[in-house]
Amino acid sequence: MYYHHSHQGWSGDYPRQQSWGQPPPSSYPYPYSSNAQYQPPPGPPPTSHYAPPPGPPPSHYYPPPGSYPSPAPSPYYGQHHTPTPPPQSSSPHQRSYHNHSPSWGQNLPPRPPQESQHFGRGAPSNYRFQYSNCTGRRKALLIGINYIGQPNQLRGCINDVTNMSTFLNEKYGYRREDMVILTDDQKNPMSIPNKANILRAMQWLVKDAQPNDSLFIHFSGHGGRTPDLDGDEEDGYDDVIYPLDYRTAGHIVDDDMHAIMVRPLRPGVRLTAIFDSCHSGTALDLPYVYSTQGILKEPNLAKEAAMDLFSAINSYGKGDLSSVAQTAIGFFKKAANGDTARQRTVMTKTSPADVVMFSGSKDTQTSADTFQDGEARGALSWAFIKTLQQRPNQSYLQLLNSIRNELEGKYTQKPQLSCSHPLGMCNASLVPPRTEID
């Protein structure tokens, strides 16, 4: 079932300052990867219990997007820049974010601390990150690709984006005019999820982000793996997503997505990412990975120093940021010897910002399409929305377990939670719903 989108601002009527600018060059300089060789995405996973998909749905017309200026380079962590306050908003729901509702009480998970946080014992004193209080501007990029007419066509990805946009607007205060939606059932060429449009939209999402802004990216489509070319992956493979034109333009590698959307972010900016695709466990290359028990696992932080952090202590999962695995001390000392903060950030894939990602499966797993509520859906997208509709105020640990409980017994995939910094798993997870703060 496919919906006709009638809301202004889904893929058009954006404010003038949001400009796409010129198309990116065909060959990207660093930090973009050269995807000279790539493999087609696999077919639908065997867990998909439905008949072959029908033909393409009727085309939907979307008004052309407003002009989007080409995003200027954002300052990297450690470089000098003049802080600017978050932009003022005239929208009622944004004005109300500055006063916490009394309903946030004893039975609700605590909000994250607002002071600057240290990465842990052994880290340089200036190596810090900042949680977001999510009182600033809200922007969302939603990408759904059914690969209409292609051999490995999917059924639920466009529905995922339709449902996610409604959910974010109605429950979390994201305005339609602050969303960019890319789906392959649109007539407007700027709203087609080809590689160039996806990369431009990712740049738009993070452009001019200020402390306490809430950015959101959702991808539903094919994902895969490709041999790692820069030696930063423990298993020797990079995670990739497949744009609509992957056969001619190539895939998009996790290194590139990290460089575009994570590396430029300033302290206190929240980026929430949902990747509902195969092999998406570390699609943003975030170093901290958590289990349903809240225990830090499989950290990539010490790879460059040839250290083992697999025995990282449970304090991260319990919200104790005062300590870190003892084995990390030597690595951080090495990073402090003459390296700039930016170099350390690039090397470790950490960030001073507040970046959290839920992915549909581990790096080695496939994700399933499902049929829920009378329509085809991505399993993670469906479970994410359902659990937060039933219980909006959950901690990270509760939300991860809720999603897994929805999927358990129906699918073999295990969703993952990863972060750019040590995460207090008992803290409140997402930005407050409008009903809690209006």
UniProtKB/Swiss-Prot annotation:
Biased composition, Pro residues: where in the chain? 39-74
Family statement drawn from the similarity comment of this UniProt entry: Belongs to the peptidase C14B family.
Cite the InterPro entries for this sequence. Answer: Caspase-like_dom_sf, Metacaspase, Pept_C14_caspase
Q: What is this protein called?
A: Metacaspase-1B
Q: Name one GO molecular function term.
A: cysteine-type endopeptidase activity
- What function does this protein fulfil? Involved in cell death (apoptosis).
The superkingdom of the source organism is Eukaryota
Annotated region Disordered: the residues are: 1-125
Q: Which Pfam families match?
A: Peptidase_C14
> Catalytic positions?
222, 278
**GO CC terms, sorted:** cytoplasm
User: Could you say which EC number(s) this protein's record lists?
Assistant: 3.4.22.-
GO BP: apoptotic process; proteolysis
Quote the biased-composition stretches of kind Low complexity, using this chain's numbering.
29-38
Source organism (scientific name): Aspergillus niger (strain ATCC MYA-4892 / CBS 513.88 / FGSC A1513)
Q: Which UniProt keywords apply?
A: Apoptosis, Hydrolase, Protease, Thiol protease, Zymogen
